[in-house]
Structures are given as structure tokens and as C-alpha cells.
Amino acid sequence: QEGNVCHRPCFRCHVCGETIAACAACSICIGCEEVVEDACAGNPCYWCDNCGVNDGSHRTTRDTADKTHGGSQRDRFFQSIA
């Protein structure tokens, strides 16, 4: 681990249990669209493999993610393959 870059999947979905590498700004589970929580026991896991954002916090709401990135991660995923 270097600085705030965590090389492990650090967020776990509350609902479907999937663990994904994500950040507080876009931590929406693609599987079920629920907000995920960090699963790294307080390590600095703010780095996002998907969007590169590091906002220095571990949690977010879907509303925050939508405002920050202009839509949920799932929405952007399906737009990207359309």
C-alpha cells in the first residue's frame, strides 16, 4: 500500500456482499446499486480503481455519488457499453 492507494478491494456491499475496489465518491455496487461500506478496518482505502477520485472519506450516499459523478456507477457502466 502506498499513501492512500489501496491495492485490495476495500468496500463491501451491504446487500449483496460483493467486495469491490471503490471510493467514497462512487461506491455504488454495480450488482445491486446499494452503497457499499469499507471492509479494510480503517486503513486508508480512498483510492478508486474506477474513477481515480480520492476524496479522503470512506463512505457516501447515493445522492453524493450522483452529484459528484453525474449518475451512479451502474448507470455509467451501462452507458459505457451502450
UniProtKB/Swiss-Prot annotation:
Disulfide bonds: none annotated. The keyword Secreted applies. Its main location: secreted. One of its GO terms (molecular function) is ion channel regulator activity. Keywords: Disulfide bond, Ion channel impairing toxin, Neurotoxin, Secreted, Toxin. It comes from the Eukaryota. The keyword Protein biosynthesis does not apply. Acts as a neurotoxin by inhibiting an ion channel. This is Turripeptide OL139. It comes from Iotyrris olangoensis.
